[in-house]
Amino acid sequence: MTTRTPSSGWLSRLAQGSLVKQILIGLVLGVLLALVSKPAAIAVGLLGTLFVGALKAVAPVLVLMLVMASIANHQHGQKTSIRPILFLYLLGTFSAALTAVLFSFLFPSTLHLTTAADSITPPSGIVEVLRGLLMSMVSNPIDALLNANYIGILVWAVGLGFALRHGNDTTKNLINDVSHAVTFIVKVVIRFAPLGIFGLVSSTLATTGFETLWGYAQLLLVLVGCMLLVALVINPLLVFWKIRRNPYPLVLTCLRESGVYAFFTRSSAANIPVNMALCEKLNLDRDTYSVSIPLGATINMAGAAITITVLTLAAVHTLNIPVDLPTALLLSVVASLCACGASGVAGGSLLLIPLACNMFGIPNDVAMQVVAVGFIIGVLQDSCETALNSSTDALFTAAACMAEDDQLAKNALRG
């Protein structure tokens, strides 16, 4: 007869307990520590750095192995939902840009253009953005893995997957086993999320605080309000259009189990393993989500479209530049295209603002001052943007899979 020690029972309960509740506890403790002792809060920031680093380390390998395994083991005639998911990604991004235009006209914001981010070089035009994306596709596979170039990783994974379809069953089984092993490592890393978020919250509050954000309160309200509208109204409408049933159980599940992580890690790449685990929990098709989730992390950028649009129009309002309806609609298209290319640009959505500003004849030095404002409010803006982007990847993947499988739509959210 074996006896369990109290410590082993405690660890077992901790490992099997509700991750969301543990994260909330970590969040509250992080806030309290930042209020009580700033040096201690900064010190425990190492926990957050380690957690984000672990997610970023495992994500490229996870994407490579899952995509390669799913394509190599794909059976001829087996249906996937990649096309409808891709359509939802593009439609969602454009809808977000339109929403941002509407919000910017209803609640016009102005900026204090005093400093410029001179050390950063933005892309000169949409052609350069597209060129960057194409060059990412032909990246060396080792370089793509080392630098977390997910576009390059996807291209190599798809190519190797198709090539390995002609391999023998032993090879395919080996790749499948490796992908399962990597998935297990991801699950272990995710269990440390409460500690990671505890460290991230405490160090962020201790080092930056929120004093600097008050000067841009209206701009932040427009940005965050627009993102909330997209997350809680626009996206549910798109999901309802696909699954023809109440979308909110799925929407809230994705926000709770994907958006919360993304908000604190502020990295779509780091959130790929989290989204993969959520899709597995929802019993979605592995062949579909193993491709759509990393693809979404590179092109599904509703939050980026909102950031580019709102900050560009804030600069326009500050400079008293008149904007007519056709120009505003064109900005929505440009912002959507820029957002889809944000993953191919160092600095992401903020450094694509000068490209959109160029539409209105705004000089580059002024546009870079807008970028500087973006960095000032980045503590909150980047967190909300990433939460919207990443949770939408899982949401649209689930919606498309449920639209194909009615039984899945009925059962996926039970329990």
UniProtKB/Swiss-Prot annotation:
Question: GO MF terms on file?
Answer: neutral L-amino acid:sodium symporter activity
Please provide an example of a Pfam family that matches this protein in its UniProt record.
SDF
Output the GO biological process annotations, alphabetical, semicolon-separated: serine transport; threonine transport
Q: Where in the cell is it found?
A: Cell inner membrane
Q: How does it sit in the membrane?
A: Multi-pass membrane protein
Cellular component GO terms held in the UniProt record:
plasma membrane
> What is the predominant subcellular site recorded for this chain?
membrane
Which terms are listed as keywords in the entry?
Answer: Amino-acid transport, Cell inner membrane, Cell membrane, Membrane, Symport, Transmembrane, Transmembrane helix, Transport
Identify its protein family: Belongs to the dicarboxylate/amino acid:cation symporter (DAACS) (TC 2.A.23) family.
Q: Would you tell me the protein name for this molecule?
A: Serine/threonine transporter SstT
Gene source species: Klebsiella pneumoniae subsp. pneumoniae (strain ATCC 700721 / MGH 78578)
